[in-house]
Protein backbone atom coordinates (compact mmCIF):
# COMPACT_ATOMS: atom_id res chain seq x y z
CA UNK A 1 0.00 0.00 0.00
CA UNK A 2 2.92 2.26 0.64
CA UNK A 3 4.65 3.78 -2.34
CA UNK A 4 7.56 6.15 -2.62
CA UNK A 5 6.88 9.82 -2.91
CA UNK A 6 6.57 10.96 -6.50
CA UNK A 7 7.22 14.14 -8.43
CA UNK A 8 4.30 15.64 -10.28
CA UNK A 9 5.01 18.10 -13.11
CA UNK A 10 1.67 17.74 -14.84
CA UNK A 11 -1.70 16.17 -14.29
CA UNK A 12 -1.81 13.40 -11.66
CA UNK A 13 -0.56 10.11 -13.16
CA UNK A 14 -2.94 7.18 -13.45
CA UNK A 15 -2.53 4.46 -10.80
CA UNK A 16 -0.47 2.19 -13.12
CA UNK A 17 1.98 4.99 -13.79
CA UNK A 18 2.17 5.72 -10.08
CA UNK A 19 3.09 2.12 -9.41
CA UNK A 20 5.80 2.22 -12.03
CA UNK A 21 7.18 5.35 -10.49
CA UNK A 22 7.20 3.64 -7.09
CA UNK A 23 9.77 1.16 -8.38
CA UNK A 24 12.31 3.91 -9.07
CA UNK A 25 11.47 7.05 -7.11
CA UNK A 26 13.10 10.34 -7.98
CA UNK A 27 12.85 13.82 -6.61
CA UNK A 28 13.61 16.69 -8.97
CA UNK A 29 13.84 20.36 -7.99
CA UNK A 30 11.03 22.52 -9.27
CA UNK A 31 11.93 25.13 -11.87
CA UNK A 32 12.62 28.49 -10.26
CA UNK A 33 10.45 31.51 -10.96
CA UNK A 34 13.30 33.19 -12.86
CA UNK A 35 13.75 30.17 -15.09
CA UNK A 36 10.04 30.01 -15.79
CA UNK A 37 9.97 33.68 -16.68
CA UNK A 38 12.81 33.17 -19.14
CA UNK A 39 10.93 30.48 -21.03
CA UNK A 40 7.54 30.17 -22.60
CA UNK A 41 6.82 26.76 -21.05
CA UNK A 42 6.39 26.15 -17.32
CA UNK A 43 7.63 22.76 -16.10
CA UNK A 44 6.15 22.97 -12.62
CA UNK A 45 2.41 22.99 -11.93
CA UNK A 46 0.90 26.14 -10.58
CA UNK A 47 -1.89 26.15 -8.00
CA UNK A 48 -5.16 26.61 -9.88
CA UNK A 49 -7.41 29.57 -9.28
CA UNK A 50 -9.45 29.04 -6.16
CA UNK A 51 -6.97 26.63 -4.57
CA UNK A 52 -7.46 25.95 -0.83
CA UNK A 53 -6.31 28.52 1.70
CA UNK A 54 -3.75 27.53 4.32
CA UNK A 55 -6.51 26.70 6.82
CA UNK A 56 -8.36 24.47 4.34
CA UNK A 57 -5.39 22.44 3.20
CA UNK A 58 -5.11 18.77 4.07
CA UNK A 59 -2.69 18.08 6.91
CA UNK A 60 -0.11 15.47 5.95
CA UNK A 61 2.48 14.24 8.44
CA UNK A 62 6.14 14.20 7.44
CA UNK A 63 8.20 12.08 9.85
CA UNK A 64 11.92 12.85 9.99
CA UNK A 65 14.18 10.28 11.67
CA UNK A 66 17.54 11.62 12.84
CA UNK A 67 20.74 9.62 12.99
CA UNK A 68 21.48 8.26 16.46
CA UNK A 69 24.61 10.44 16.57
CA UNK A 70 22.89 13.64 15.44
CA UNK A 71 22.94 16.58 17.84
CA UNK A 72 21.01 18.95 15.58
CA UNK A 73 18.11 20.85 17.12
CA UNK A 74 14.69 19.60 16.11
CA UNK A 75 13.65 23.15 15.19
CA UNK A 76 16.55 23.51 12.75
CA UNK A 77 15.86 20.15 11.11
CA UNK A 78 12.15 20.94 10.86
CA UNK A 79 12.88 24.27 9.16
CA UNK A 80 15.31 22.62 6.72
CA UNK A 81 12.79 19.93 5.75
CA UNK A 82 10.05 22.52 5.27
CA UNK A 83 12.32 24.53 2.96
CA UNK A 84 13.13 21.37 1.00
CA UNK A 85 9.44 20.57 0.52
CA UNK A 86 8.58 24.16 -0.45
CA UNK A 87 11.31 24.20 -3.10
CA UNK A 88 9.80 21.26 -4.95
CA UNK A 89 6.49 20.66 -6.69
CA UNK A 90 5.30 17.32 -5.46
CA UNK A 91 2.41 14.96 -5.26
CA UNK A 92 2.08 13.42 -1.82
CA UNK A 93 1.72 9.68 -1.28
CA UNK A 94 2.85 7.50 1.62
CA UNK A 95 6.47 6.49 1.42
CA UNK A 96 10.07 7.70 1.72
CA UNK A 97 11.36 10.99 0.35
CA UNK A 98 14.95 10.98 -0.95
CA UNK A 99 17.22 13.36 0.93
CA UNK A 100 18.63 15.88 -1.58
CA UNK A 101 22.35 15.52 -2.24
CA UNK A 102 22.78 19.29 -2.34
CA UNK A 103 21.75 19.74 1.31
CA UNK A 104 24.74 18.83 3.53
CA UNK A 105 22.85 19.66 6.74
CA UNK A 106 20.09 17.13 6.06
CA UNK A 107 22.53 14.54 4.74
CA UNK A 108 24.60 14.77 7.91
CA UNK A 109 21.71 14.59 10.37
CA UNK A 110 18.71 12.88 8.78
CA UNK A 111 18.45 9.14 8.26
CA UNK A 112 14.96 9.03 6.76
CA UNK A 113 12.13 11.30 5.66
CA UNK A 114 8.73 9.64 5.38
CA UNK A 115 5.33 10.86 4.16
CA UNK A 116 2.38 9.49 6.17
CA UNK A 117 -1.41 9.67 6.41
CA UNK A 118 -2.27 9.78 2.71
CA UNK A 119 -3.61 6.22 2.45
CA UNK A 120 -7.26 7.25 2.71
CA UNK A 121 -6.81 9.42 -0.39
CA UNK A 122 -4.77 6.98 -2.44
CA UNK A 123 -7.28 4.21 -1.70
CA UNK A 124 -9.85 6.37 -3.49
CA UNK A 125 -7.48 6.94 -6.44
CA UNK A 126 -6.94 10.57 -5.46
CA UNK A 127 -3.53 12.21 -5.74
CA UNK A 128 -2.68 14.96 -3.27
CA UNK A 129 -0.85 17.77 -5.06
CA UNK A 130 1.50 20.16 -3.30
CA UNK A 131 -0.96 23.07 -3.29
CA UNK A 132 -3.62 20.93 -1.56
CA UNK A 133 -1.38 19.93 1.32
CA UNK A 134 0.02 21.52 4.45
CA UNK A 135 2.87 19.27 5.64
CA UNK A 136 3.34 18.87 9.39
CA UNK A 137 6.94 17.89 10.17
CA UNK A 138 7.74 15.62 13.14
CA UNK A 139 11.43 15.22 14.05
CA UNK A 140 12.53 12.35 16.30
CA UNK A 141 15.30 9.94 17.28
CA UNK A 142 14.84 6.26 18.15
CA UNK A 143 15.64 4.93 21.60
CA UNK A 144 17.92 1.89 21.46
CA UNK A 145 17.65 0.99 25.15
CA UNK A 146 15.24 -1.93 24.72
CA UNK A 147 12.62 -2.99 27.26
CA UNK A 148 13.20 -2.65 30.98
CA UNK A 149 11.48 -4.83 33.56
CA UNK A 150 9.98 -3.87 36.89
CA UNK A 151 11.40 -6.55 39.21
CA UNK A 152 8.88 -8.54 41.19
CA UNK A 153 9.14 -9.36 44.86
CA UNK A 154 10.33 -12.73 46.18
CA UNK A 155 11.31 -14.03 42.72
CA UNK A 156 7.83 -13.38 41.34
CA UNK A 157 7.13 -12.32 37.77
CA UNK A 158 7.82 -8.69 36.88
CA UNK A 159 4.63 -6.67 36.92
CA UNK A 160 5.36 -4.77 33.70
CA UNK A 161 7.84 -4.11 30.90
CA UNK A 162 8.77 -0.54 30.02
CA UNK A 163 9.95 1.05 26.76
CA UNK A 164 11.17 4.56 26.09
CA UNK A 165 9.41 5.75 22.93
CA UNK A 166 9.90 6.04 20.05
CA UNK A 167 11.75 2.72 20.28
CA UNK A 168 13.98 1.13 17.66
CA UNK A 169 12.22 -2.16 18.36
CA UNK A 170 8.93 -0.79 17.00
CA UNK A 171 10.32 1.11 14.01
CA UNK A 172 8.34 0.19 10.88
CA UNK A 173 5.70 -1.74 12.83
CA UNK A 174 2.90 0.72 11.98
CA UNK A 175 3.54 0.46 8.24
CA UNK A 176 3.66 -3.35 8.35
CA UNK A 177 0.16 -3.64 9.82
CA UNK A 178 -2.50 -3.72 7.12
CA UNK A 179 -6.20 -3.50 7.95
CA UNK A 180 -9.39 -2.18 6.47
CA UNK A 181 -9.10 1.39 5.24
CA UNK A 182 -9.48 3.95 7.99
CA UNK A 183 -8.93 1.80 11.11
CA UNK A 184 -5.46 3.09 11.93
CA UNK A 185 -6.36 6.70 11.09
CA UNK A 186 -9.45 6.43 13.29
CA UNK A 187 -7.28 5.39 16.24
CA UNK A 188 -4.82 8.22 15.59
CA UNK A 189 -7.58 10.82 15.43
CA UNK A 190 -9.20 9.45 18.59
CA UNK A 191 -5.98 9.72 20.59
CA UNK A 192 -5.31 13.24 19.33
CA UNK A 193 -8.84 14.34 20.29
CA UNK A 194 -8.62 12.69 23.73
CA UNK A 195 -5.37 14.47 24.57
CA UNK A 196 -6.67 17.78 23.19
CA UNK A 197 -9.89 17.65 25.22
CA UNK A 198 -7.92 17.04 28.41
CA UNK A 199 -5.33 19.73 27.72
CA UNK A 200 -8.03 22.31 26.95
CA UNK A 201 -9.79 21.56 30.22
CA UNK A 202 -13.09 20.32 28.82
CA UNK A 203 -15.42 19.58 31.76
CA UNK A 204 -15.63 15.75 32.00
CA UNK A 205 -18.98 16.07 33.76
CA UNK A 206 -20.44 17.56 30.58
CA UNK A 207 -18.40 15.73 27.93
CA UNK A 208 -17.20 12.28 28.95
CA UNK A 209 -14.10 10.52 27.66
CA UNK A 210 -11.77 8.06 29.40
CA UNK A 211 -8.76 7.69 27.05
CA UNK A 212 -9.28 3.91 26.94
CA UNK A 213 -9.06 1.86 23.73
CA UNK A 214 -10.30 -1.74 23.46
CA UNK A 215 -9.25 -3.76 20.42
CA UNK A 216 -11.02 -7.10 20.17
CA UNK A 217 -11.08 -9.94 17.68
CA UNK A 218 -9.74 -13.44 17.01
CA UNK A 219 -6.14 -14.36 17.89
CA UNK A 220 -3.37 -13.54 15.43
CA UNK A 221 -4.92 -10.42 13.91
CA UNK A 222 -2.26 -8.06 15.25
CA UNK A 223 -4.14 -6.36 18.08
CA UNK A 224 -1.16 -6.21 20.44
CA UNK A 225 1.17 -5.10 17.65
CA UNK A 226 -1.31 -2.39 16.66
CA UNK A 227 -1.38 -1.07 20.23
CA UNK A 228 2.42 -0.89 20.34
CA UNK A 229 2.56 0.70 16.89
CA UNK A 230 -0.09 3.24 17.90
CA UNK A 231 1.90 4.20 20.99
CA UNK A 232 5.03 4.55 18.84
CA UNK A 233 3.22 6.70 16.28
CA UNK A 234 1.68 8.98 18.92
CA UNK A 235 5.04 9.40 20.67
CA UNK A 236 6.38 10.77 17.37
CA UNK A 237 3.38 13.03 16.73
CA UNK A 238 3.42 14.52 20.25
CA UNK A 239 7.21 14.74 20.62
CA UNK A 240 7.09 18.54 20.62
CA UNK A 241 4.52 18.51 23.46
CA UNK A 242 5.96 15.73 25.64
CA UNK A 243 9.72 15.45 26.08
CA UNK A 244 9.45 11.84 27.26
CA UNK A 245 7.12 9.03 26.18
CA UNK A 246 6.83 5.60 27.79
CA UNK A 247 5.03 2.37 26.99
CA UNK A 248 4.12 0.24 30.01
CA UNK A 249 3.12 -3.31 29.06
CA UNK A 250 1.34 -4.88 32.02
CA UNK A 251 2.07 -8.53 32.77
CA UNK A 252 -1.43 -9.58 33.80
CA UNK A 253 -0.31 -12.98 35.08
CA UNK A 254 1.92 -11.34 37.68
CA UNK A 255 -1.10 -9.69 39.31
CA UNK A 256 -2.67 -12.91 40.54
CA UNK A 257 -1.63 -14.23 43.92
CA UNK A 258 -2.07 -17.59 45.58
CA UNK A 259 -3.11 -15.68 48.69
CA UNK A 260 -6.75 -14.71 49.04
CA UNK A 261 -7.50 -10.99 48.51
CA UNK A 262 -3.87 -10.31 47.56
CA UNK A 263 -4.53 -9.92 43.81
CA UNK A 264 -6.53 -6.74 44.23
CA UNK A 265 -3.68 -5.23 46.25
CA UNK A 266 -1.18 -6.12 43.51
CA UNK A 267 -3.33 -4.30 40.93
CA UNK A 268 -3.48 -1.22 43.16
CA UNK A 269 0.29 -1.34 43.69
CA UNK A 270 0.95 -1.53 39.95
CA UNK A 271 -1.26 1.46 39.17
CA UNK A 272 0.37 3.41 41.99
CA UNK A 273 3.69 3.07 40.12
CA UNK A 274 2.01 4.17 36.89
CA UNK A 275 0.52 7.19 38.65
CA UNK A 276 4.00 8.21 39.81
CA UNK A 277 5.08 8.24 36.16
CA UNK A 278 2.19 10.38 34.94
CA UNK A 279 2.70 12.94 37.71
CA UNK A 280 5.50 14.31 35.52
CA UNK A 281 3.56 16.56 33.14
CA UNK A 282 6.14 16.31 30.36
CA UNK A 283 5.83 12.51 30.31
CA UNK A 284 3.27 10.83 28.01
CA UNK A 285 2.47 7.32 29.25
CA UNK A 286 0.78 4.50 27.33
CA UNK A 287 -0.46 1.57 29.42
CA UNK A 288 -0.92 -1.66 27.43
CA UNK A 289 -2.99 -4.45 28.98
CA UNK A 290 -2.92 -7.45 26.66
CA UNK A 291 -5.73 -10.01 26.91
CA UNK A 292 -7.50 -7.79 29.40
CA UNK A 293 -10.19 -10.43 29.98
CA UNK A 294 -7.76 -12.16 32.34
CA UNK A 295 -8.01 -9.11 34.64
CA UNK A 296 -11.46 -7.78 33.82
CA UNK A 297 -13.31 -11.09 33.91
CA UNK A 298 -17.04 -10.69 34.26
CA UNK A 299 -18.04 -10.42 37.92
CA UNK A 300 -21.25 -12.27 37.13
CA UNK A 301 -19.18 -15.42 36.53
CA UNK A 302 -17.64 -15.12 39.99
CA UNK A 303 -21.03 -14.61 41.59
CA UNK A 304 -22.36 -17.73 39.88
CA UNK A 305 -19.39 -19.71 41.19
CA UNK A 306 -17.66 -20.44 37.87
CA UNK A 307 -14.81 -18.04 38.71
CA UNK A 308 -12.85 -17.59 41.98
CA UNK A 309 -14.44 -14.96 44.21
CA UNK A 310 -11.09 -13.16 44.41
CA UNK A 311 -11.57 -12.14 40.77
CA UNK A 312 -14.29 -9.73 41.91
CA UNK A 313 -11.68 -7.84 43.91
CA UNK A 314 -9.36 -7.77 40.89
CA UNK A 315 -12.05 -6.28 38.65
CA UNK A 316 -13.08 -3.75 41.29
CA UNK A 317 -9.45 -2.72 41.84
CA UNK A 318 -8.83 -2.40 38.09
CA UNK A 319 -11.90 -0.21 37.52
CA UNK A 320 -11.09 1.97 40.54
CA UNK A 321 -7.48 2.53 39.47
CA UNK A 322 -8.46 3.30 35.88
CA UNK A 323 -10.93 5.89 37.12
CA UNK A 324 -8.13 7.51 39.14
CA UNK A 325 -5.91 7.76 36.06
CA UNK A 326 -8.70 9.58 34.24
CA UNK A 327 -7.79 12.81 36.02
CA UNK A 328 -4.32 12.84 34.48
CA UNK A 329 -4.13 14.32 30.95
CA UNK A 330 -0.98 12.49 29.83
CA UNK A 331 -1.98 8.81 29.95
CA UNK A 332 -3.74 6.56 27.43
CA UNK A 333 -4.79 2.98 28.23
CA UNK A 334 -4.62 0.47 25.36
CA UNK A 335 -6.25 -2.94 25.85
CA UNK A 336 -6.81 -6.06 23.75
CA UNK A 337 -9.12 -9.03 24.09
CA UNK A 338 -9.76 -12.28 22.25
CA UNK A 339 -13.01 -12.93 24.14
CA UNK A 340 -15.04 -9.75 24.61
CA UNK A 341 -18.01 -11.65 26.06
CA UNK A 342 -15.84 -12.56 29.07
CA UNK A 343 -15.04 -8.93 29.94
CA UNK A 344 -16.95 -7.16 32.67
CA UNK A 345 -19.57 -4.85 31.17
CA UNK A 346 -18.41 -1.97 33.38
CA UNK A 347 -14.96 -2.14 31.78
CA UNK A 348 -16.36 -2.36 28.25
CA UNK A 349 -18.54 0.66 28.96
CA UNK A 350 -15.49 2.70 29.99
CA UNK A 351 -13.72 2.15 26.66
CA UNK A 352 -14.11 5.13 24.32
CA UNK A 353 -13.30 3.08 21.22
CA UNK A 354 -14.18 -0.58 20.87
CA UNK A 355 -12.68 -1.55 17.52
CA UNK A 356 -13.06 -5.00 16.03
CA UNK A 357 -9.85 -6.30 14.41
CA UNK A 358 -10.82 -9.25 12.25
CA UNK A 359 -9.03 -11.44 9.72
CA UNK A 360 -7.49 -9.43 6.87
CA UNK A 361 -9.54 -8.62 3.80
CA UNK A 362 -8.49 -9.75 0.31
CA UNK A 363 -6.73 -6.45 -0.30
CA UNK A 364 -4.92 -6.65 3.05
CA UNK A 365 -3.94 -10.29 2.45
CA UNK A 366 -2.50 -9.38 -0.94
CA UNK A 367 -0.52 -6.45 0.43
CA UNK A 368 0.77 -8.50 3.38
CA UNK A 369 2.08 -11.22 1.06
CA UNK A 370 3.40 -8.58 -1.34
CA UNK A 371 5.40 -6.91 1.42
CA UNK A 372 6.86 -10.30 2.38
CA UNK A 373 7.97 -11.02 -1.20
CA UNK A 374 9.45 -7.56 -1.61
CA UNK A 375 11.58 -8.19 1.47
CA UNK A 376 12.77 -11.57 0.13
CA UNK A 377 13.66 -9.88 -3.16
CA UNK A 378 15.51 -7.11 -1.34
CA UNK A 379 17.78 -9.49 0.55
CA UNK A 380 18.33 -11.74 -2.48
CA UNK A 381 16.56 -14.89 -1.26
CA UNK A 382 14.33 -14.65 -4.33
CA UNK A 383 15.86 -13.98 -7.74
CA UNK A 384 14.40 -11.58 -10.27
CA UNK A 385 12.60 -13.01 -13.26
CA UNK A 386 14.18 -13.64 -16.63
CA UNK A 387 14.73 -10.89 -19.14
CA UNK A 388 17.07 -8.80 -17.02
CA UNK A 389 14.33 -6.52 -15.67
CA UNK A 390 13.78 -6.05 -11.96
CA UNK A 391 10.58 -7.59 -10.66
CA UNK A 392 7.96 -5.06 -9.60
CA UNK A 393 4.95 -6.58 -7.87
CA UNK A 394 1.99 -4.31 -8.48
CA UNK A 395 -0.06 -2.79 -5.70
CA UNK A 396 -3.55 -4.20 -5.27
CA UNK A 397 -5.30 -1.35 -7.07
CA UNK A 398 -2.76 -1.27 -9.89
CA UNK A 399 -3.27 -5.00 -10.41
CA UNK A 400 -7.05 -4.58 -10.56
CA UNK A 401 -6.64 -1.98 -13.32
CA UNK A 402 -3.98 -3.89 -15.27
CA UNK A 403 -5.11 -7.50 -14.95
CA UNK A 404 -6.47 -7.50 -18.52
CA UNK A 405 -3.26 -6.02 -19.92
CA UNK A 406 -1.66 -7.99 -22.82
CA UNK A 407 1.39 -8.48 -20.59
CA UNK A 408 -0.55 -11.18 -18.73
CA UNK A 409 0.53 -13.59 -21.45
CA UNK A 410 4.15 -13.07 -20.38
CA UNK A 411 4.83 -15.65 -17.64
CA UNK A 412 7.61 -13.46 -16.25
CA UNK A 413 5.77 -10.13 -16.45
CA UNK A 414 4.80 -8.11 -13.40
CA UNK A 415 1.07 -8.41 -14.09
CA UNK A 416 1.21 -12.19 -14.42
CA UNK A 417 3.31 -12.67 -11.29
CA UNK A 418 1.14 -10.24 -9.34
CA UNK A 419 -1.85 -12.27 -10.53
CA UNK A 420 -0.30 -15.41 -9.02
CA UNK A 421 0.16 -13.53 -5.77
CA UNK A 422 -3.47 -12.44 -5.94
CA UNK A 423 -4.53 -16.07 -6.37
CA UNK A 424 -2.57 -17.01 -3.24
CA UNK A 425 -4.26 -14.16 -1.35
CA UNK A 426 -7.69 -15.40 -2.43
CA UNK A 427 -6.92 -18.90 -1.18
CA UNK A 428 -5.85 -17.51 2.21
CA UNK A 429 -9.32 -16.26 3.16
CA UNK A 430 -9.85 -16.80 6.88
CA UNK A 431 -6.16 -16.99 7.80
CA UNK A 432 -4.84 -14.52 10.35
CA UNK A 433 -2.20 -11.92 9.60
CA UNK A 434 0.22 -13.84 11.82
CA UNK A 435 -0.23 -16.98 9.71
CA UNK A 436 0.05 -15.03 6.45
CA UNK A 437 3.48 -13.70 7.38
CA UNK A 438 4.65 -17.27 8.04
CA UNK A 439 3.56 -18.52 4.60
CA UNK A 440 6.56 -17.20 2.61
CA UNK A 441 8.94 -18.97 5.01
CA UNK A 442 6.99 -22.24 4.74
CA UNK A 443 6.80 -21.89 0.95
CA UNK A 444 10.54 -21.33 0.68
CA UNK A 445 11.20 -24.40 2.82
CA UNK A 446 9.14 -26.49 0.40
CA UNK A 447 10.91 -25.59 -2.87
CA UNK A 448 13.38 -28.05 -4.39
CA UNK A 449 16.27 -25.59 -4.73
CA UNK A 450 15.91 -22.99 -1.95
CA UNK A 451 19.38 -21.49 -2.55
CA UNK A 452 18.37 -20.19 -6.00
CA UNK A 453 14.63 -19.65 -6.04
CA UNK A 454 12.97 -17.99 -9.02
CA UNK A 455 10.09 -15.68 -8.18
CA UNK A 456 7.67 -17.50 -10.48
CA UNK A 457 8.46 -20.91 -8.98
CA UNK A 458 8.22 -19.45 -5.51
CA UNK A 459 4.75 -18.02 -6.16
CA UNK A 460 3.49 -21.42 -7.30
CA UNK A 461 4.96 -22.92 -4.12
CA UNK A 462 3.25 -20.17 -2.12
CA UNK A 463 -0.13 -21.10 -3.62
CA UNK A 464 0.38 -24.77 -2.71
CA UNK A 465 1.50 -23.83 0.80
CA UNK A 466 -1.55 -21.60 1.26
CA UNK A 467 -3.87 -24.43 0.20
CA UNK A 468 -2.17 -26.84 2.60
CA UNK A 469 -2.22 -24.36 5.49
CA UNK A 470 -5.91 -23.60 4.97
CA UNK A 471 -6.75 -27.31 4.81
CA UNK A 472 -4.88 -27.96 8.07
CA UNK A 473 -6.52 -25.01 9.83
CA UNK A 474 -9.96 -26.38 8.97
CA UNK A 475 -9.02 -29.83 10.23
Curated annotation (Swiss-Prot):
ATP-binding as UniProt keyword: yes
Any single biological process term in GO: reciprocal meiotic recombination
Cysteines engaged in disulfide bonds, as pairs: none
Null allele phenotype: Male and female sterility due to defects in meiosis.
GO MF term list: ATP binding; ATP hydrolysis activity
Keywords: ATP-binding, Chromosome, Meiosis, Nucleotide-binding, Nucleus
SMART domains: AAA
Highest taxon above the source species: Eukaryota
GO terms under cellular component: chromosome; nucleus
Localization in the cell: Nucleus; Chromosome
Pfam families the record matches: AAA (PF00004), AAA_lid_TRIP13_C (PF23242), TRIP13_N (PF23563)
Tissues in which the protein is found: Highly expressed in young panicles.
Annotated ATP binding sites: 217-224
Family: Belongs to the AAA ATPase family. PCH2 subfamily.
Function (record text): Plays a key role in chromosome recombination during meiosis. Required for the initiation of meiotic recombination and the recruitment of PAIR2 onto meiotic chromosomes. Essential for meiotic DNA double-strand break (DSB) formation.
Description of how the protein assembles with itself and partners: Interacts with PAIR1 and ZEP1.
PANTHER family, per database record: PACHYTENE CHECKPOINT PROTEIN 2, PACHYTENE CHECKPOINT PROTEIN 2 HOMOLOG
Name of the protein this chain belongs to: Pachytene checkpoint protein 2 homolog
Organism of origin: Oryza sativa subsp. japonica (Rice)
